[in-house]
Amino acid sequence: MFCFISSLCLSQQTEEFKLIKNYYNQHRSMLSKEFRKKFDAETNNYYKASIKQDYQLFMQKMDSIENVALTGALLKTKNLEDLDKLKLLNKNLPLEPSHTPSVVIDKAADYPGGINELRKEVADLFYLGGIYSDIKTIKANVGFIVETDGRISNVKAEGDNYTFNRQAEIAVYSVSQKFSPAIVNGNPVRYRFRLPLTMNIE
């Protein structure tokens, strides 16, 4: 599930994903207040039901628009990571550090609250409206690097469903907290982390 990799300076900021989430959550909050005012002011139950239906439809559209923005952030992030890899190639440095099985890891990289908290947060961040599948149970293995400062980079989901893979990558890049980095000989090191995901789509 895990393997150690030596330290290199490729770091990915997930700040853009957080900014997008915060932006759309702020707009959801403002819209909810406005719809609530309109709903509370209406006395006719038929119109109240219509306002509620409009609100639900509007929020579904907001989710879809947010997903488009997150997909754009994912493409930008992957392009920037590819450019970083090209810079390493130009400097004749290896893209992937050599795996050293004999190195003893003092402490593995860990997410605050542990693996179950990470799985829960990733599941909560999934946008199911962006997944297209005839199969109800979808699986993917998500690999990424935990950098020495706890940020994540090079997220890559591998599975049979492209849309599920893309949503998995967006969800992992969007997690709210940094990891505690792996430690070798008292020093933080880059660490390859694997997260198997299974989701039932209804």
Segments the model singles out, each with a brief description of its role:
Residues 12-202:
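Charge-biased low-complexity segments
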Residues 6-8:
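N-terminal signal peptide c-region/cleavage motif recognized by signal peptidases
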Residues 1-3:
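Sec-dependent signal peptide recognition
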